[in-house]
Amino acid sequence: MNKYIIYLIALVSGVLGVFAFSPFDYWGLAYVSLLGLIFVAKTSKKSTALFATFLWSMGFFCFGVNWLNVSIHQFGGASLGVSYFLVSLLSAYLALYPMLFTYLVQRFNVQSAVIFSVIWTFTEFLRGWLFTGFPWL
């Protein structure tokens, strides 16, 4: 499959994942989003899969933690450009954990849904705990 189509699938499925949370609460989209990520992780070469996972994460986190722009801009006094830059930087950091998921899935050629779940839970635990964590979203 063309890598640009894979990138598009990853980005769109990442953005769709945001709609599983409040205020939208379309909880079924969480499954669609994760299935898009797993599809990318299993059907792509390592470099393509890692970049696609980065795009998935940026779509998921940039839109999901967009509320931080209000905090940084209105209450922190930073310019809007700085606010968007900081949220993008945070999203890029948070992308490391789904990228670790993709790396582990490819490294160990995971085929079992249970092992997918274990690896995902492990990387989410790290995201919520490591360096004081960021468990939201």
Protein language model features and the residues they cover:
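Membrane-embedded alpha-helical bundles of multi-pass enzymes
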Residues: M1-L137
